[in-house]
């Protein structure tokens, strides 16, 4: 991977900074929370997708310490973590509506 990065850097005259490894371990998200969020989404006719993710962020650290966790993702036209990253405000507001609704009414 380092060789590929070096090729890209040379070709594009850019520099990658990979940062420190977090060494966080993969974790399963909480099935009860997933069901609550899924049911709320359905009740509001907001399409949702349950999927595995390699993203860890803080949720995997919390989950590995026994803290019930899950992650909500906002649909992103060009994928995340790239210069062309783009999110439609409609999709952002749908996730906000679900998060706010669950926190306000279900938890």
Where are these regions (language model features)?
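His/Asp/Glu-rich mid-to-C-terminal helical/loop segments that flank catalytic regions of hydrolases
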Residues: 2-4, 74-107
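Hydrophobic pocket-lining residues that define ligand/cofactor binding sites across diverse proteins
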Residues: 9, 41, 103-106
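Acidic-enriched catalytic cores of C-N bond-cleaving enzymes acting on peptides and small amides
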Residues: 1-15
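Active-site-adjacent substrate-binding region
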Residues: 12-15, 19-74
């Amino acid at each position: 991977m380092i060789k590929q990065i070096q090729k890209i850097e040379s070709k594009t005259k850019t520099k990658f900074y990979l940062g420190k490894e977090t060494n966080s371990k993969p974790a399963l998200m909480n099935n009860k929370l997933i069901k609550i969020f899924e049911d709320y989404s359905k009740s509001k006719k907001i399409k949702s997708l349950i999927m595995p993710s390699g993203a860890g962020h803080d949720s995997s650290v919390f989950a590995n310490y026994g803290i019930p966790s899950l992650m909500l993702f906002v649909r992103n036209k060009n994928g995340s973590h790239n210069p062309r990253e783009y999110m439609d405000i409609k999709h952002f507001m749908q996730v906000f509506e679900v998060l706010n609704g669950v926190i306000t009414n279900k938890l």
